[in-house]
């Protein structure tokens, strides 16, 4: 069964096993780790473990490794390296082709192809696929498609082997192949730092490791330039639109230097100048800083300052008495408006740009309804939008009008290389007279640039949001910069209306925002604190609340309850919470299929969240013929069916049904628990907030607590440490964001 190559490593004998893959017991799609059952050359069955990217049934393999004894599973062959050989026997070829590798070839057709062409099968698939049409039932078109798929699979397997050999995630394969096709390996060998492109989301050190393995110079211009671009791009995720040059130089030199290699500031400055000359960067003195921008960020910020300043100065004249119209409308309205609400409605009628801000219970929604009534009376065609699907649905429910996400409004799509493009733009503007945009605190400057670019000339824009909530995940602090620039007419609603005063959720949200401790409700209230400290106790209490106590005592279904946490991994973060909640709310069952992907098990009935924008996913409306494309970051759905043979699953997002292939599962996370950041823009009947010890201090801030509280409509339960709650209330630090939008708006006013 085995032979060995005559050497030892670390006192272990390294042996060689040759065999054919009979069963794939376990496969991790993210890193290619697998447990295989092999039929060895002498007929014995071998269990092998190791990294086998894109391994298929029927493949002949040569494994190098050693025997180990697993405490549960017994003797296994731990593989250190392997070579693959395509099968040469008719049976092996049929098994390989019929394993689901190629869409349209099942076991029967695979057997026919193998029998017809024998050991020449793979050569024909690669070079003469049209010959497949010699078989009954295969058209010329199908033959070419089978050949295309086989060629693509072969090229992707080579790429996977290259990535695996160099310790890079094999999950990069489809991304690299989609952009670079069969030239991916050559491109990586020429410039490993292309992996630092945000499209691939690879840590710089991994790309650096590949460069060192390939023998490239660690003082090369390519490495320095890549380090600068990586640092600037990485800091977009921290909300910065630029970085002061002195901080950039320090960060780049730290990134690129070690005990053996020193990259000094002079070399980094030359890199900045080089990239500026190529048009990749902009260096500018603004807001009292020597600022370095990525070109796109600079252009977005400058464009917004120019356009918003222009819109803020635009006033509308009418050939009738607007005050009389407003007075008549407000008197006849079913709503009663405060003086500030009336001021907001009047300002929106007269100005090209207006901001409406305020906390919970201050009447923002009622004011929006009043603005809509006035816009209708003025004959304006108005569109409603919000950053996320849930926020758009909530806006639609509250106003009775259709509301779309910004991406849907602008008809977003993908260009080559994964770039987002919008069909609506200055050359194809929106068909409207006004846009009302809700939850503006979530919107970063790049998305805002796209919206402003798509507004028709003369259109009004009403921005609605709570400036005390979390800033956007992306670059900039758009809403706060606009308000503090004092360039844009802003109405801040501060009066808490009587009905809202009856809610302890609303009153405690305002208390926290003012730096005061929240007060738990009495027995019939809507705000409770359950004191627990250690993560295990918090997580178990949360699971009991969701599975038993809240459904039993309040009648909430699990779908009406959302668990929130400030963090993902630490303490009572969403990852350990989701594992326990899945176990409590959707345990394994013979009637439910499941798919393991990395460390996550996806099961029929699971609640999941899309964690990146995907403009290509096709969806159908339930009970309707309507079709569309695109599922976006933050969309929450339920897995309704898993199809192992077809390697796909079907997910329902509200009234839309979408199919995900298994190689797309890196875009999904379990969503029984989500971070407070991910929850922004949504409201839930019941919120359970997990605040154990051990959460990262940088996430224990007042505005995170305030944002979490304001997600709850009918019930909020904090399960956690009193000390953590107190720390968050007293911690009013807001992370510094380097942005010059406010400075540009003020500068434009003086010119």
Language-model-derived ranges and their functions:
Residues 12, 33-41, 47-48, 56-288, ...:
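Accessory alpha-helical DNA-binding modules that contact the DNA backbone or grooves
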Residues 13-28, 65, 636-640:
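Structural detector for short beta-strands of small beta-barrel domains
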Residues 164, 233-237, 280-343:
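Pre-P-loop entry segment of helicase/translocase ATPase cores
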Residues 242, 342-345, 350-524:
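ASCE P-loop NTPase helicase motor core
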Residues 467-629, 640:
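Conserved helicase motor core of P-loop NTPases
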């Amino acid at each position: 069964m085995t032979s060995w190559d005559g050497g030892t490593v670390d006192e272990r004998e390294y042996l060689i096993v040759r065999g054919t893959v009979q069963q794939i017991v376990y496969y991790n799609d993210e890193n290619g780790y697998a447990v295989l059952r092999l039929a060895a050359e002498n007929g014995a069955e071998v269990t092998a473990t190791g990294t086998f990217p894109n391994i298929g049934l029927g493949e002949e393999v040569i494994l190098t490794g050693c025997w180990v004894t697993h405490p549960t599973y017994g003797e296994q062959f731990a593989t250190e390296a392997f070579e693959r050989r395509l099968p040469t026997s008719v049976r092996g070829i049929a098994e390989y082709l019929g394993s689901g590798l190629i869409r349209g070839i099942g076991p029967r057709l695979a057997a026919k192809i193998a029998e017809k062409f024998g050991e020449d099968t793979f050569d024909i698939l690669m070079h003469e696929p049209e010959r497949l049409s010699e078989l009954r039932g295969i058209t010329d078109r199908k033959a070419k498609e089978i050949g295309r798929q086989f060629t693509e699979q072969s090229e992707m397997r080579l790429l996977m082997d290259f990535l695996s050999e160099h310790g890079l995630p094999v999950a990069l394969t489809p991304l690299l192949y989609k952009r670079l096709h069969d030239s991916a390996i050559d491109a990586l060998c020429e410039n490993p730092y292309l992996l630092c492109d945000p499209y691939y989301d690879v840590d710089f050190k991994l790309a650096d490791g590949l460069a060192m393995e390939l023998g490239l110079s660690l003082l090369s211009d390519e490495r320095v330039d890549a380090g600068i671009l990586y640092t600037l791009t990485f800091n977009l995720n921290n909300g910065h639109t630029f970085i002061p040059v002195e901080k950039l130089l320090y960060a780049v030199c730290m990134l690129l230097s070690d005990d053996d290699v020193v990259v000094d500031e002079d070399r980094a400055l030359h890199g900045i100048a080089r990239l500026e000359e190529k048009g990749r960067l902009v260096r500018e003195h603004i807001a009292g800083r020597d600022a370095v921008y990525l070109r796109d960020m600079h252009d977005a910020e400058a464009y917004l300052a120019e356009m918003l300043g222009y819109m803020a100065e635009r006033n509308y004249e009418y050939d009738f008495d607007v005050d009389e119209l407003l007075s008549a409308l407000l008197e006849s309205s079913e709503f009663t408006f405060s003086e500030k609400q009336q001021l907001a409605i009047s300002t929106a009628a007269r100005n090209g740009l207006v901001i409406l801000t305020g906390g919970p219970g201050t009447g923002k929604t009622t004011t929006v309804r009043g603005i809509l009534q006035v816009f209708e009376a003025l004959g304006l065609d108005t569109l409603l939008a919000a950053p996320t699907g849930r926020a758009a649905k909530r806006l639609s429910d509250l106003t009775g009008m259709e509301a779309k996400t910004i991406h849907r409004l602008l008809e977003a799509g993908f260009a080559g290389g994964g770039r987002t493009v919008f069909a609506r733009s200055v050359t194809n503007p929106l068909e409207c007279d006004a846009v009302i945009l809700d939850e503006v605190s979530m919107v970063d400057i790049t998305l805002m640039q796209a919206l402003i670019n798509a507004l028709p000339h003369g259109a009004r824009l009403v921005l609605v949001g709570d400036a005390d909530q979390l800033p956007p995940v992306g670059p900039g602090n758009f809403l706060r910069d606009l308000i503090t620039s004092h360039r844009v007419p802003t109405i801040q609603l501060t009066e808490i209306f009587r009905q809202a005063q009856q809610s302890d959720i609303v009153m405690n949200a305002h208390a926290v925002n003012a730096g005061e401790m929240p007060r738990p409700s009495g027995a019939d209230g809507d705000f409770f604190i359950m004191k627990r400290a250690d993560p295990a106790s918090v997580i178990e209490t949360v699971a009991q609340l969701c599975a038993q106590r809240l459904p039993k005592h309040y009648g909430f279904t699990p779908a009406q309850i959302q668990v929130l946490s400030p963090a993902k991994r630490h303490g009572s973060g969403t990852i350990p919470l989701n594992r326990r909640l899945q176990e409590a709310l959707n345990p394994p069952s013979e009637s439910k299929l499941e798919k393991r992907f990395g460390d996550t098990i996806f099961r029929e009935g699971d609640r999941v969240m899309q964690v990146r924008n995907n403009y290509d996913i096709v969806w159908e409306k339930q009970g309707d013929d309507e079709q569309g494309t695109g599922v976006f970051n933050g969309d929450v759905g339920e897995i309704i069916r898993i199809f192992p043979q077809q390697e796909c699953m079907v997910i329902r997002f509200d009234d839309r049904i979408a199919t995900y292939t298994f190689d797309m599962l890196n875009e999904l996370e379990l969503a029984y628990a989500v971070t407070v950041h991910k929850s922004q823009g949504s409201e839930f009947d019941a919120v359970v907030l997990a605040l154990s010890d051990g959460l990262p201090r940088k996430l224990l801030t007042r505005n995170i607590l305030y944002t979490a509280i304001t997600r709850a409509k009918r019930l909020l339960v904090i399960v956690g440490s009193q000390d953590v709650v107190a720390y968050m209330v007293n911690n009013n630090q807001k992370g510094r964001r380097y942005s010059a939008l406010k400075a540009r708006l003020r500068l434009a006013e003086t010119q």
